[in-house]
């Protein structure tokens, strides 16, 4: 079955092409740390031959606690992104939270991301669609894979079909997430075979019901990522940090930066294997 290709400059993203890595840090903590993490990702992905897009947030507007670190904000965040692009020539993905942010962010980065908690907000979707930028839509934890077709339709109505879908797990009772591996193919089907990627980092979140920051299950990142890659996906979304225990956001779910290369070697091996198989139709 023909898969839709979404191009991010010279990077082609599709479910039947070699996977693209969307990776970096959860939130911009400092200019120097962003440069360090981006350079390490680039070194590893270039060595392994993996197409790469740098990820970081300039504002974590949905933090649980009013006291949690949010990021440097729009103006300073765009300055850091511009320096990363000038220094490394890297593609960048970041999220927007308000319609007014869509165009200023799209003027700097290559992919704008629709956060899971905001994925059904029509005004935000319309503003993002108007930019003409490549869009990454995070599937809300409370939305079924089949309902993602409605969000894609909103972007199409807004004149933008350059849409990537991303799963980050579904609510499983209170304060826990699980990943339905069957959901990936459903998301492909309802979106006209748009590229589907897997955010393994945020799927590992597991909250303390009485705590402010999210907990996580970093020790299981490789096994969950291996399971997702075995489905046959367009890309993998993974955040890393040189010192996860002291990261300003989602450290318990972050991959230790030093483990990035062996982690990606496993992911590439699985991706190469799965995409070397002939398509098998078991529906009849």
Curated annotation (Swiss-Prot):
The keyword Amino-acid biosynthesis does not apply. Coiled coil: none annotated. Keywords: Cytoplasm, Lipopolysaccharide biosynthesis, Transferase. InterPro entries: Aldolase_TIM, DAHP1/KDSA, KDO8P_synthase. One of its GO terms (molecular function) is 3-deoxy-8-phosphooctulonate synthase activity. It catalyses: D-arabinose 5-phosphate + phosphoenolpyruvate + H2O = 3-deoxy-alpha-D-manno-2-octulosonate-8-phosphate + phosphate. Its main location: cytoplasm. Pathway: Carbohydrate biosynthesis; 3-deoxy-D-manno-octulosonate biosynthesis; 3-deoxy-D-manno-octulosonate from D-ribulose 5-phosphate: step 2/3; Bacterial outer membrane biogenesis; lipopolysaccharide biosynthesis. It is an enzyme of class 2 (transferase). The keyword Cell inner membrane does not apply. This is 2-dehydro-3-deoxyphosphooctonate aldolase. It comes from Escherichia coli O6:K15:H31 (strain 536 / UPEC). The lineage of its organism: Bacteria, Pseudomonadati, Pseudomonadota, Gammaproteobacteria, Enterobacterales.
